[in-house]
Amino acid sequence: MDKQNQIGDFLKFLGPQIGQEIHVGPWLEIDQQRINQFAEVTGDQQWIHIDPERAAKESPYGTTVAHGYLTLSLLPYLTQSNHPDFFQKNYPGMKYRVNYGLNRVRFPSPVKVGSKIRARTTIQTAEEVKNGVQICYIITVDIESEEKPACSVEFLARLYP
């Protein structure tokens, strides 16, 4: 089958899923070790992230909180989007996916140390682009037992046959 037909078939496959939640990921506990490792790697050593004693006294949250970008960096795990089973199920006929970008990244609520987070993924749009398909996902990262999410983002991915 030629690439143009593969693209057309893939768009037909995606059509009924537009606007649908396609995945709810596993809960992941955010511990202080993970926060500290992220701080070390990124150089973001702000006390609100890495100093539990000071955060307990001075932070409005009463504890340390994860970096917003830590939450964002966990999207591949939280969405399971790079797992071979996820790829095979959700991208039939496609060989590879590349991250194209992010829109509307927001961090409505902090992730306190010890909190559990998970991601919900919804397909917003799918359209043909040169030699492939671009999908815009809405990803919402929930915090267990919290009303407001930790993060919401439009994630753009491009897939190619």
What are these model-derived regions, one by one?
Residues M1-Q17, F107-P161:
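HotDog/MaoC-like acyl-thioester-processing domains
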Residues D2-V98:
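Hot-dog-fold acyl-thioester-processing enzymes
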Residues Y100-R104:
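A beta-strand/beta-hairpin structural motif
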